[in-house]
């Protein structure tokens, strides 16, 4: 379904995720193959760095998912959740699955004392109305940055700090 989301976001050609990579990220203890370990599954220790929830029918058909990870606010001194992907198949939209997935993440925030749940949304995405109705607000004062590809490789060549992160 990640590839379905990429197609919806008009970026299908950019999505390179394999089932093996996703499995290794979500279940690192089960990442037994060398290729899975090389994909970064064990980069942060024995626990997963990526978490997921699914929406499924009583028959077990998955029709939606939320993939997320922890972030940390140095200003507030607590963790939060960053929602990497939220997707509900078009045939299942409007039945509460998206709200239920977000409610599950909000519940985790409340139970663990996290102060925020945040995500990025493409400016043309009609789901923005749904998010507004939930009480989410656009953070127009922040500008996202990204380093990737050749720029990432070039940056990695610069001198680094000594010691472990």
Please provide the spans of the model-predicted regions:
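Conserved acyl-donor/pantetheine-binding loop and adjacent beta-alpha core of acyl/acetyltransferases
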Residues: 33, 74-81
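Conserved active-site alpha-helix within GNAT-family acetyltransferase domains
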Residues: 95, 99-103, 110-112, 123-141, ...
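Conserved N-terminal entry element of GNAT/NAT acetyltransferase domains
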Residues: 7, 152-165
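Glycine-rich phosphate-binding loop
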Residues: 92
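Conserved beta-strand in the GNAT
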Residues: 52-54, 61-70, 82, 87
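Conserved GNAT-fold acetyl-CoA-binding loop/helix
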Residues: 2-40
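Conserved hydrophobic beta-strand within the GNAT/NAT acetyltransferase core sheet
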Residues: 83, 117-121
């Amino acid at each position: 379904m990640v590839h379905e989301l990429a197609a919806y976001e008009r970026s299908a050609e950019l999505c390179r995720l394999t089932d093996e990579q996703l499995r290794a990220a979500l279940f690192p203890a089960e990442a037994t193959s060398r290729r899975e370990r090389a994909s970064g599954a064990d980069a942060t220790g024995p626990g997963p760095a990526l978490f997921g929830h699914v929406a499924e029918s009583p028959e077990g058909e998955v029709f939606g998912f939320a993939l997320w990870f922890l972030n940390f606010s140095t200003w507030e001194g607590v963790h939060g959740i960053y929602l990497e992907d939220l997707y509900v198949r078009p045939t299942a939209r409007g039945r509460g699955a998206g709200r239920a997935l977000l409610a599950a993440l909000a519940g985790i925030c409340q139970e663990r004392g996290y102060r925020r749940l945040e995500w990025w949304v493409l400016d043309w995405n009609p789901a923005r109305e749904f998010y507004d109705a939930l009480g989410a607000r656009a953070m127009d004062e922040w500008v996202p940055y990204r380093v990737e590809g050749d720029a990432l490789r070039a940056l990695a060549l610069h001198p680094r700090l000594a010691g472990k992160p």
